[in-house]
């Protein structure tokens, strides 16, 4: 008896995205030579027909660009946030606040 734990749908959707990305990346047409200079001036009909039947090569390229930009923004944002949080000037555990600040008034 098989039980579904919720990762199966995630796996299927990830597989579909990777399959679509793979077909997008590998759907380019190879350059085929034409019929030759002596056999006519028309274009290679096989290449033209094949190109017309395939979907556009860059149909989903904007999604890839947005994905890369999003990852870059998250990386830079986390670096900036981590740096600013680590550089807090007025920390209560600072030795100045613990030992020196209260004793200066006694002198």
Swiss-Prot record:
Glycans are attached at residues 5, 22, 45. Residues 31-54 are annotated as: Disordered. Pfam families: ISK_Channel. One of its GO terms (cellular component) is neuronal cell body membrane. One of its GO terms (molecular function) is potassium channel regulator activity. It is a single-pass type I membrane protein. Residues 82-103 are cytoplasmic. Coiled coil: none annotated. Keywords: Cell membrane, Cell projection, Cytoplasm, Glycoprotein, Ion transport, Membrane, Potassium, Potassium transport, Transmembrane, Transmembrane helix, Transport. It is found in: Cell membrane; Cytoplasm; Perikaryon; Cell projection, Dendrite. Residues 72-83 are annotated as: Interaction with KCNQ1. GO terms for biological process: intracellular chloride ion homeostasis; membrane repolarization during action potential; membrane repolarization during ventricular cardiac muscle cell action potential; negative regulation of delayed rectifier potassium channel activity; negative regulation of membrane repolarization during ventricular cardiac muscle cell action potential; negative regulation of potassium ion export across plasma membrane; potassium ion export across plasma membrane; potassium ion transmembrane transport. It comes from the Eukaryota. The chain crosses the membrane at residues 61-81. InterPro entries: K_chnl_KCNE, K_chnl_volt-dep_bsu_KCNE3. Belongs to the potassium channel KCNE family. Ancillary protein that functions as a regulatory subunit of the voltage-gated potassium (Kv) channel complex composed of pore-forming and potassium-conducting alpha subunits and of regulatory beta subunits. KCNE3 beta subunit modulates the gating kinetics and enhances stability of the channel complex. Alters the gating of the delayed rectifier Kv channel containing KCNB1 alpha subunit. Associates with KCNC4/Kv3.4 alpha subunit to form the subthreshold Kv channel in skeletal muscle and to establish the resting membrane potential (RMP) in muscle cells. Interacts with KCNB1. Interacts with KCNC2. Associates with KCNC4/Kv3.4. Interacts with KCNQ1; associates with a KCNQ1:KCNE3 stoichiometry of 4:4; produces a current with nearly instantaneous activation with a linear current-voltage relationship and alters membrane raft localization; affects KCNQ1 structure and gating properties. This is Potassium voltage-gated channel subfamily E member 3.
């Amino acid at each position: 008896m098989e039980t579904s734990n919720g990762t199966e749908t995630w796996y299927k959707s990830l597989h579909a995205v990777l399959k679509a990305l793979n077909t997008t990346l590998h759907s380019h047409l190879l350059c085929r030579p034409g019929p030759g200079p002596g056999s006519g001036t028309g274009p290679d009909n096989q290449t033209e027909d094949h190109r017309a039947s395939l979907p556009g090569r860059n149909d989903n390229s904007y999604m890839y660009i947005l994905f890369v930009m999003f990852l870059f923004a998250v990386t830079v944002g986390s670096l900036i946030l981590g740096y600013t949080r680590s550089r807090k000037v007025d920390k209560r555990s600072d030795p100045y606040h613990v030992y020196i600040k209260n004793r200066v008034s006694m002198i």
